[in-house]
């Protein structure tokens, strides 16, 4: 549905709005990266299993484990220790995830009022965090031991933040005015 909405409506409206001469200049979604940090995994190897499975069910794709690049004694982390998991979504899985995120997970998020425009990075990419991964319907609340957050990065082909914001607004992303 999201992909069809983009092809049918959004491309035409963005092309007219920004006066592009070619359809290929219209910004599009490139990928969505989801990261779940698991600090407990540095000391307990089995602590990564549950978040790994949860991220797998949320994304619909097998995550990759992430490891510490260097040792940090304050966090009791050694170089090479498992510190989380991540997944990169492209094409159809990306659109399916964003649809579930916007219409199901974000409305269920506690105290969510919308995204800030300041969350753009200056190059047309958008990053935000979710405090509770149980907002997704794929997670069974009774089977989890700890509520975890996740970071979501949306990478677009937009040149500026203004173009990326218009693309995400057309996809029904909830922004609040600053």
UniProtKB/Swiss-Prot annotation:
<comment type="function">
    <text>This is one of the proteins that bind and probably mediate the attachment of the 5S RNA into the large ribosomal subunit, where it forms part of the central protuberance. In the 70S ribosome it contacts protein S13 of the 30S subunit (bridge B1b), connecting the 2 subunits; this bridge is implicated in subunit movement. Contacts the P site tRNA; the 5S rRNA and some of its associated proteins might help stabilize positioning of ribosome-bound tRNAs.</text>
</comment>
<dbReference type="InterPro" id="IPR020929">
    <property type="entry name" value="Ribosomal_uL5_CS"/>
</dbReference>
<keyword id="KW-0687">Ribonucleoprotein</keyword>
<keyword id="KW-0820">tRNA-binding</keyword>
<dbReference type="GO" id="GO:0003735">
    <property type="term" value="F:structural constituent of ribosome"/>
</dbReference>
<keyword id="KW-0689">Ribosomal protein</keyword>
<dbReference type="Pfam" id="PF00281">
    <property type="entry name" value="Ribosomal_L5"/>
</dbReference>
<dbReference type="InterPro" id="IPR031309">
    <property type="entry name" value="Ribosomal_uL5_C"/>
</dbReference>
<dbReference type="GO" id="GO:0000049">
    <property type="term" value="F:tRNA binding"/>
</dbReference>
<comment type="subunit">
    <text>Part of the 50S ribosomal subunit; part of the 5S rRNA/L5/L18/L25 subcomplex. Contacts the 5S rRNA and the P site tRNA. Forms a bridge to the 30S subunit in the 70S ribosome.</text>
</comment>
<dbReference type="GO" id="GO:0019843">
    <property type="term" value="F:rRNA binding"/>
</dbReference>
<dbReference type="InterPro" id="IPR031310">
    <property type="entry name" value="Ribosomal_uL5_N"/>
</dbReference>
<keyword id="KW-0699">rRNA-binding</keyword>
<dbReference type="GO" id="GO:0006412">
    <property type="term" value="P:translation"/>
</dbReference>
<dbReference type="GO" id="GO:1990904">
    <property type="term" value="C:ribonucleoprotein complex"/>
</dbReference>
<keyword id="KW-0694">RNA-binding</keyword>
<protein>
    <recommendedName>
        <fullName>Large ribosomal subunit protein uL5</fullName>
    </recommendedName>
</protein>
<comment type="similarity">
    <text>Belongs to the universal ribosomal protein uL5 family.</text>
</comment>
<dbReference type="InterPro" id="IPR022803">
    <property type="entry name" value="Ribosomal_uL5_dom_sf"/>
</dbReference>
<dbReference type="GO" id="GO:0005840">
    <property type="term" value="C:ribosome"/>
</dbReference>
<dbReference type="InterPro" id="IPR002132">
    <property type="entry name" value="Ribosomal_uL5"/>
</dbReference>
<dbReference type="Pfam" id="PF00673">
    <property type="entry name" value="Ribosomal_L5_C"/>
</dbReference>
<dbReference type="InterPro" id="IPR020930">
    <property type="entry name" value="Ribosomal_uL5_bac-type"/>
</dbReference>
């Amino acid at each position: 549905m999201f992909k069809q909405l983009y092809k049918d409506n959004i491309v035409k409206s963005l092309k007219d709005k920004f006066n592009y001469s070619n359809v290929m200049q219209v910004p599009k979604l490139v990928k969505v990266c989801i990261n779940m940090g698991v600090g407990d995994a540095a000391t307990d190897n089995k602590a990564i299993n549950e978040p790994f499975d949860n991220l797998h069910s949320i994304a619909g794709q097998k995550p990759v484990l992430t490891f510490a690049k260097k040792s940090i004694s304050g966090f009791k982390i050694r170089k090479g220790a498992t510190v989380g998991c991540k997944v990169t979504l492209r094409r159809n899985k990306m659109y399916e995830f964003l649809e579930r995120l916007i219409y199901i997970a974000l409305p269920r998020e506690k105290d969510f009022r919308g995204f800030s425009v300041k969350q753009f990075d200056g190059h047309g990419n958008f990053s935000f965090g979710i405090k509770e991964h149980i907002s997704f319907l794929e997670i069974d609340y009774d089977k989890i031991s700890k509520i975890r957050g996740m970071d979501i990065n949306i990478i677009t082909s937009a040149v500026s933040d203004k173009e990326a914001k218009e693309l995400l607004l057309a996809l029904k992303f909830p922004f609040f005015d600053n």
